[in-house]
Design a protein with these regions (language model features):
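A short, flexible beta-alpha/helix-coil linker loop
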Residues: 27-29, 122
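Charged phosphate-binding loop/patch that engages nucleotide di/tri-phosphates or the phosphate backbone
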Residues: 123-145
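A short gly/proline-enriched turn/hairpin at secondary-structure junctions
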Residues: 31-35
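Conserved N-terminal beta-strand and adjoining loop/helix that marks the start
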Residues: 1-19, 92-95
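Unchanged
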Residues: 37-130
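Short, acidic/hydrophobic/Gly-rich beta-strand patch recurrent on exposed beta strands
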Residues: 21-23
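Residues that recognize and position ribonucleotide moieties
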Residues: 3-5, 30, 87-88, 115
Length: 145
């Protein structure tokens, strides 16, 4: 079994409370932007790079930073997922907000589309259940509802 360390970002627009998802070509599902952490790359760097590569957006990661200035932002969570071949993906998940006002667009071959969704719209599209659970958590913790 291979272990792949990944980083991803749940991006919420603070004004509209919508989440940005990418349509993953292989899975044919809407997922948060993210991907494998490269050698000599921190999880934060990988998360920011993957978001930019997949959507063209620059984001700011939100979360507690431990006391020392060069410590990392505490991730929203860490998730284990096994794929059909039995490989394990360990995903370090962050919460982020956009810092530029460009319209996101699919930039990588892995994704076919990029779109903002309201929480209600998530019930009408093909997403993994944890996407809804995580969005509900972010809306409650950061936006009071």
């Amino acid at each position: 079994m291979n272990r792949n360390f990944c980083a991803s970002v749940f991006i919420i627009n603070p004004e509209t409370k919508k989440i940005l998802l990418v349509k993953h070509k292989k899975m044919n599902k809407w997922v948060q932007p993210g991907g494998h952490i490269e050698n000599n790359e921190t999880p934060e760097e990988a998360a920011l790079r993957e978001v930019y590569e997949e959507t063209g957006l620059k984001v700011s990661l939100i979360g507690e930073r431990f006391p020392r200035e060069d410590d990392f932002i505490k991730p929203l969570g860490i998730q284990r997922n096994a794929n059909k071949m039995g490989d394990l993906h360990i995903d370090i998940i962050y919460y982020g907000v956009p810092v530029n006002n460009i319209e996101p667009h699919a930039l990588e071959d892995e994704n076919t589309d990029v779109k903002w969704f309201s929480r209600e719209e998530l019930d009408k599209i093909d997403v993994f259940p944890d996407i809804k659970i995580t969005m509900d958590y972010i809306l409650k913790e950061y936006y009071g509802g």
